[in-house]
Amino acid sequence: MSLNAERSYKMKLRDVENAFKYRRIPYPKRSVELIALLAISCTFFLFMHTNKLNSRLKEMEVKLQPSEFSALGLTGNHISGHDAGKHDDINTLHGTYQYLKSTGQKVGYNVHDRRSSEEQLRTPTAHGHHHDHHSHHHHMHQQEKIDGHKHKASHDKQLAVPDNKHKEDEVHYEDDEDEVEENDDDLANDVGTTDSEGFNFKADLLNNTKYAEVDFVFFNRVPKVGSQSLMELMARLGKINGFTHARNKGSAHETIVMNKQRQNDLIADLLTRPKPHIYSQHIAYINFTRFHLPKPIYINLIRDPIDRIISWHYYIRAPWYYRDMQAKLGENAIPMPSEEFMNLDLDTCVRNHDPHCTFTQMQIKNPVGDHRRQTLFFCGMNQKLCMPFNSEAAMQKAKRTVETEYAVVGTWEDTNITLSVLEAYIPRYFRNAKVAYYLGKDRLSRVNRNNVTRIVSDETRLILRKNLTNEIEFYEFCKQRLYLQYAALSHGKRFGEDDYLLVPEQQNEYNEDY
């Protein structure tokens, strides 16, 4: 083939190749329009569907916020009391969430941020009205002491609770000393973040046990909340978990508010006792660190304020109560009152404005000694702040103390939740608490129980409710905190069916030496 012929052949071959490579396949005009319309339709559908899905997710987020409580089976019946007049905002799960939000508890998982803010406020300059007796040198000394206890964090997470079995004596809130402290300093706590095995992050943030500086539990028990049963349980757990327990000496009258010297003497005595140990007494909250002494683990129990008043009214009108005091205290016991006093029912007492049943707002010393102030046991020893009855200021101070100082504040109204939280947050003392409780439930449920009681009318309950507004708010606050602690442990799920413990049948001989 000649050179020209070969070149012509190659050019034709290249033209064919280019024609094939850059070929254009014709489409009907209608097909192009359909494809464009389909693309636009798909884009619009995806946009609308995504927007609707986003709105639905936001709605579900709000509805599912309290899911940790619904997973626990906590409904309005668990949170509210018997009466119809209770706060509407916690009678539903969504209401519970809104209540927690309004009190700052739902964002309470940012406890480290809160504590950091409090630390800044508690410097000698910013907090001078609380620390006008402390120098900058002492502030640095206290910080060094707190830092020195950091290495105990994992051990301190395993501390806490009270003991013993004894009847509650009639008590008076009036202090038997002239001097009552006027300043009840807040405690500056170190912030720990170390988790131990079995703890999740949220539970750790709600656990104050790790801030304890000594292996000692202080149970400043509130009267008529079932503290005798808890002390009996502690007596049994002491044999299992290896700690000692004690309570104050019985007396005809209890001193709830003490002056500074008596507080110091009591603390010094308690800190010299062999450890680990627990101590219980009817006494208002004591701030150990204001005496430059190590902080213990604080625990307590609460009860519906209306039920407490009903319980107290009939407790001091039970003949066996005075016979028991006579047997224990002899000639120092209070004599049995008149028959008229013993037979006075609460409905009549409230209706006739008897001094025993008159609830004057902001009253500092009521005519008769009783236990109408549950907040006092958490507010502290500042008589001017904490003694006025149903005081909002006392209630707010009590809330703050519970949130920053107390490891656990439980209630027998939620037995399984309380025992579960105690076991998990203070295992050093409460390990096996549920087993011990259910094995001895018959005995524990009868400790100090008063069968001398009567039905109280709805009218009387309503009158009490109107006069105990801040006491009731504090009680509800403590229950919400307890539920949060439990929910944090369970990751929003049940531990078991209602967290009931299945205990195998046992012979009764354990009652003798358990």
UniProtKB/Swiss-Prot annotation:
GO CC field? chromosome; Golgi apparatus; Golgi membrane; nucleus
Active-site residues are H282
- InterPro entries from the entry? Heparan_SO4_2-O-STrfase, P-loop_NTPase, Sulfotransferase
- Which residues are on the Lumenal side of the membrane? 51-514
Q: Which Gene3D superfamilies match?
A: P-loop containing nucleotide triphosphate hydrolases (3.40.50.300)
Q: Supply the enzyme class, top level.
A: transferase
- Which EC numbers does the record give? 2.8.2.-
Subcellular location per the Swiss-Prot or TrEMBL entry:
Golgi apparatus membrane
GO terms under biological process: dorsal/ventral axis specification; embryonic pattern specification; regulation of multicellular organism growth; Toll receptor ligand protein activation cascade
Q: Can you tell me where the transmembrane regions are?
A: 31-50
Where do Acidic residues bias regions lie? 171-185
User: According to the UniProt topology, which residue ranges lie Cytoplasmic?
Assistant: 1-30
MF (Gene Ontology): endopeptidase activator activity; sulfotransferase activity
Give me the ranges of the annotated region Disordered.
Answer: 112-185
Residues bearing glycans: N207, N287, N416, N451, N467
Q: What results from gene inactivation? A: RNAi-mediated knockdown in females targeting all isoforms, or a combination of isoforms A, H, J and I only, results in dorsalized offspring.
Where is composition skewed (Basic and acidic residues) in this entry? Answer: 112-121, 155-170
The cross-references to Pfam families, in alphabetical order and at most eight, read: Sulfotransfer_2
PANTHER family assigned to the protein according to its UniProt record, in alphabetical order: HEPARAN SULFATE 2-O-SULFOTRANSFERASE, HEPARAN SULFATE 2-O-SULFOTRANSFERASE PIPE
Q: Which family does it belong to?
A: Belongs to the sulfotransferase 3 family.
Q: What does this protein do?
A: Sulfotransferase involved in dorsoventral axis patterning in early embryos. Required for the ventral activation of ea/easter by the protease snk in the perivitelline space between the embryonic membrane and the eggshell; activation of ea requires both activation of the ndl-gd-snk protease cascade and sulfation of a vitelline membrane component by pip.
Q: Subunit structure, per the record? A: Interacts with wbl/windbeutel; the interaction is direct and does not require pip to be folded.
In its UniProt entry, what is this protein called? Uronyl 2-sulfotransferase homolog pip
Gene field: pip
